[in-house]
Amino acid sequence: MLSIHDPLLIFTDLDGTLLNSHTFEWQPAAPWLTRLHESGVPVILCSSKTAAEMLQLQTTLNLQGLPLIAENGAVIQLDVHWEDHPNYPRLIAGISHNEIRLVLHKLREKEQFKFTTFDDVDDQVISEWTGLNRAQSALTRLHEASVSLIWRDSDERMAQFVARLNDLGLQFVHGARFWHVLDASAGKDQAANWLIEAYRRQWRARPLTLGLGDGPNDAPLLDVMDYAVVVKGLNREGVHLRNDDPQRVYRSQNEGPDGWREGMDYFFSRS
């Protein structure tokens, strides 16, 4: 089991994991977040959300100043104390949001793929799609290194679309509710490994890592963790890990923040 006194990093997905997928409630996890904060354990948020959205969430969760992984790993917000880093305050993996927009525009124009991106609609429509208020919806549109969209074509056409993207050095990632196009070099796992190495240098010791996630797109992140909590989710595909050893992986009975708390209780119950 883990100890709160270990050199430790916690990486967590948001929607469906730390946050309830429908209500965005996080309060069941509050006692653990407080304990981790008081013990100086970094809790690193990982999501398809934009950095602007996640910085606001960090403040709500009392995690401000810590690193975060946004846009499925295409953006890393650096620790507030790393201002000497040449890319401070954010690292961007691969090509920019505007460059990806241009690629998608050309593909849609040339091959008539059917999809609707967040850039195609206004804040009101985003609010209807997500259940967020208008101010929060505006933050979801502030992508820096990815494009979020709703796919409106057939599975066969999707396979063709993915092949075109791959040829252009891009990938198509399915999140909790939307699809995301980002550079093929980006990923939650690559971003997590970068941060683990940064903390190893800072602490002069390799951190132990615990990751929490609920969907198939969290598997790459959980695969690079020392320990993992698979929070019970709504996705029928489930979460398939390369190493599903029960000494390393706990699968919760509860969903969302209740499952998050359950997983933390499990790994730290003997600390």
From Swiss-Prot:
HAMAP family: MPGP_rel (MF_00617). Transmembrane segments: none annotated. The gene is yedP. The active site is at 13 (nucleophile). Its EC number is 3.1.3.70. This is Mannosyl-3-phosphoglycerate phosphatase. The keyword Transit peptide does not apply. Keywords: Cytoplasm, Hydrolase, Magnesium, Metal-binding. It catalyses: 2-O-(alpha-D-mannosyl)-3-phosphoglycerate + H2O = (2R)-2-O-(alpha-D-mannosyl)-glycerate + phosphate. It is found in: Cytoplasm. SUPFAM superfamilies: HAD-like (SSF56784). Mg(2+) binds at residues 13, 15, 214. One of its GO terms (biological process) is mannosylglycerate biosynthetic process. InterPro entries: HAD-like_sf, HAD-SF-IIB-MPGP, HAD-SF_hydro_IIB, HAD_sf, MPG_Pase. GO terms for molecular function: magnesium ion binding; mannosyl-3-phosphoglycerate phosphatase activity; phosphatase activity. One of its GO terms (cellular component) is cytosol. Its cofactor is Mg(2+). It holds the Pfam family Hydrolase_3. The keyword Chaperone does not apply. Belongs to the HAD-like hydrolase superfamily. MPGP family.
